[in-house]
Amino acid sequence: MRVLFAAAECAPMVKVGGMGDVVGSLPPALAQLGHDVRLIMPGYGKLWSSLDIPAEPIWRAQTMGTEFAVFETRHPTNGLPLYLVGHPVFDPERIYGGEDEDWRFTFFASAAAEFSWNVWKPQVLHCHDWHTGMIPVWMHQDPEISTVFTIHNLKYQGPWRWKLDRITWCPWYMQGDHTMAAALLYADRVNAVSPTYAQEIRTSEYGEKLEGLLNYISGKLRGILNGIDLEAWNPATDKALPATFSSANLAGKATCKQVLQERMGLTLNPDTFLLGMVSRLVDQKGVDLLLQVADRLLAYTDTQIVVLGTGDRGLESGLWQLASRHPGRVAVFLTYDDALSRLIYAGSDAFLMPSRFEPCGISQLYAMRYGCVPVVRKVGGLVDTVPPHDPRQKSGTGFCFDRFEPVDFYTALVRAWEAFRHPESWKELQRRGMEQDYSWARSALEYDRMYRDVCGLKEPSPDAAAVEQFSQGQEADPSRHGGASQTLSPSEEAPIESSEASSGSTPVRTSRNPLARLLGKQRR
């Protein structure tokens, strides 16, 4: 099946949040199931230098009264075809923000739609978050292209200053004025990034004023849990670590803890309970809750805290003040550093995620993979991925609390600290977390089912059936599934521009999209 991912981020080239990880890791897992998966994203100024293969122009066109070019290259890590929408509006280093943010991403969405109609026509166009929210609206009138829309974070619904009442028929939409609502209405299928979050967003507590609409479309809404790349995130082979380790041999983790304490200026003590946090420093992540309990925790327990991230100035200031009150025990690094984040996962004893809401969360998966026990609030994807530790049953992988209250968070931290004081049972807890399977292979099977459902196909793709049989302990039948990979026949291949398009004679075409023409305006 031909699948085109359209997104504002894609790791490792452009990553601001978890969406970048998903768009960078899910496509190769789908390709393993036999799908022809490609990606299209804005050609940001900072992106071009990260490419291993130079991007070549293959097509030029106009949309919304503005000319653009599409460049083709390959993803630097998974090798899948990558298309970049080139226009000066994407040249600045910034990814988000700015007064023209709504125009930029609507323009990108329209360009991606034009590309799908004119250059490479997918069977499924998979859109991610509000930045691509108008694509399902435009594709709604094309019976040959099905759309899937993934909600990574419902809170960010997209600024919108144009009057959409002239292009949408649904009265529900009139209550909103953003692209997220349009996508929810017009996408053929909608999914959230965890089963629990898919249920939560249908309530007033987590629905961000869209719970009525989400209940209205509940028949096409589902939750599919995110995964992680188990090869890229493997403490046994991670070259960024001073020492490697595994669930069978945890010795290297002590070395990582020592190096982390040295690098962050903490007092060297292997027996101190070291808490790590790698996060955007925003309201969602519960950093304010940490600030409310940290002084008391440090006063009554032998604990150290390491925080890595950037975000809200007020939260950054609060963390700096906390570190100044507790030199040698609290370290704050206000940036994002991939190598340091891996060292924090590897060197910390426990990982903090006291989130107000959490669509899925990937950090807790990285933490468990690196033997770092998560302390989380029971919300969203954290419910689906971190079963609570039960010392009597010797089950669970982390410490959980219910209410977003300082006393609940503090109690969970004290329970974790007390468990840490029993080394043997703590190692068992670490091993259980490290041995969890949150690979993309499982998630890819769910997406495969959704793709086939939306396209009206009853049988799973050949490789998907083989993988599912294998995961259930059955022997796959090569004769039934067509071997290890699926190759589309020439008749199934979507038309693509001839090679002359990349030789410099790139044609300019006007929009085939009536809605884009309706909205078409020159940038102000």
Swiss-Prot record:
Synthesizes alpha-1,4-glucan chains using ADP-glucose. Residues 489-505 have a biased composition (Low complexity). It comes from Synechococcus sp. (strain WH7803). This is Glycogen synthase. It holds the Pfam family Glycos_transf_1. Keywords: Glycogen biosynthesis, Glycosyltransferase, Transferase. It is an enzyme of class 2 (transferase). CDD domains: GT5_Glycogen_synthase_DULL1-like. Gene3D superfamilies: Glycogen Phosphorylase B.
